[in-house]
Amino acid sequence: EQGMSAYCYTGSYQIPVHTLTDSIVKDIMMIQEIIGTGEIAISDHRSSQPTFEEFARVVADTRLGGVLSGKAGIVNVHLGDSPRCLDLIERVVDETEIPASQILPTHINRNEMLFGKSIEYALKGGAVDFTGNEDIDYWETICDEVRVCNGIKRMLDAGVNPDRMTISSDGQGSLPMYSSDGEFLGMGVGQSSCLLKEVKECVFKTEIPLEIAISTITSNPADILRLKGKGKVQEGYDADLCILDQKLQL
């Protein structure tokens, strides 16, 4: 009625997943706005330390819900600092019939080790999601986080399909703040405005073509999440438009 589109995932960091009905499949089938499950945490001290079987069942149920409802049935996966990195995701892809297209790992630029593993995963056809930051220099200074523009450039140079990369903001989510010594200072709030800032960096800092940079926050997420009528300026699509000048200022 308001002309706004909104989508969400069922679940949380933990497995067993907290659902609105009594199952993941029913949530996705019966609630129009729910397009998948997430953000399931793995390789992180804040996760529920799921086993392979538990994680695989969540992905399988989410895929089934997507098939029955005509939605993406995506599992958005939070990746932490553990050296296990994408191990559970890779096992699902390698050991079951579930394709990599059902899983979207996020925070892949959290550290250098995870990023290296993510390049390997993306080269196999998996989609990967970078986490953008409002204060880009701050995060690069206090940890070994891979700057988004540098990460995308490295993936492109490695031969990753540009269509398999997205940037998300953690907008309005909790954002831990640390000192230069790694001391926890408190919680901030993620800002969705970081998305355009990261695109600017891609274009002006690492000279990534605008059509590739802008697709990470437009057509790529729309295609991966199967959001009908979204992500492109095209006849029959929603007119979700932002007007930018030559310096990419809104």
Please annotate each region the language model reported:
Residues 1-54:
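Divalent-metal coordination cores built from histidine and acidic residues
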Residues 5, 74, 127, 209, ...:
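Residue-level detector of anion-binding/catalytic polar loops
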Residues 17-19, 140, 222:
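Short Asp/Glu-rich motifs
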Residues 51-58, 71, 84-88, 114-117, ...:
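General structural feature for long, well-ordered alpha-helical segments within catalytic domains
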